Amino acid sequence: MNFLAHLHLAHLAESSLSGNLLADFVRGNPEESFPPDVVAGIHMHRRIDVLTDNLPEVREAREWFRRETRRVAPITLDVMWDHFLSRHWSQLSPDFPLQEFICYARKQVMTILPDSPPRFINLNNYLWSEQWLVRYRDMDFIQNVLNGMASRRPRLDALRDSWYDLNAHYTALETRFWQFYPRMMAQASHKAL
């Protein structure tokens, strides 16, 4: 899962949206650095990552990547799941329009920014203003996201080419998303994530 899905599942679980978004920027034990609700959100994010990576639908989807891009498939798929969530938001969350949810999420996250790591502050400088969570619905933007990650982290250069795997298996990936994401939503609503 990427930013939008983590925020969405956190909302459904009544967990800290701030902690769920912050988690990728925190190493080790967060308990000494953040309040308990944010720590709980960080731990939820980490559980979701492990759960998602081990779902049969996700493991199957990783096999569709070519040998040269399979190593980055988990990262690529995380971004792709956000694409489908953004694209189908009105079906998955009809009572909370995406733009309203984004405003709500941003307000939640802004409360922890003063005490956050610089990389997280930097992310927030463009995540909201450039409307990433809405733009995830466009495949051209997904390609830009993957290229951006590859340029910032040279060892992940294969992300550039992984876009072709997404494009080649788009319909099958969308089917897998519909198989697992509603289940995860139900788990979040029952606080079982």
Curated annotation (Swiss-Prot):
Going by the record, the broad EC class of this enzyme is hydrolase
Top-rank taxon: Bacteria
- Alphabetized InterPro entries for the sequence: ACP_PD, ACP_phosphodiesterase_gpbac
BP term (GO), one: fatty acid biosynthetic process
Write the Enzyme Commission number(s) for this entry: 3.1.4.14
Q: Give the UniProt keywords, A-Z.
A: Fatty acid biosynthesis, Fatty acid metabolism, Hydrolase, Lipid biosynthesis, Lipid metabolism
Reaction catalyzed: holo-[ACP] + H2O = apo-[ACP] + (R)-4'-phosphopantetheine + H(+)
A GO term, aspect molecular function: [acyl-carrier-protein] phosphodiesterase activity
One Pfam family it belongs to: ACP_PD
**Family indicated by similarity:** Belongs to the AcpH family.
Function of the molecule = Converts holo-ACP to apo-ACP by hydrolytic cleavage of the phosphopantetheine prosthetic group from ACP.
PANTHER family associated with the record: ACYL CARRIER PROTEIN PHOSPHODIESTERASE
Report what the protein is called.
Acyl carrier protein phosphodiesterase
> Could you read off the lineage of the organism from its UniProt record?
Bacteria, Pseudomonadati, Pseudomonadota, Gammaproteobacteria, Enterobacterales
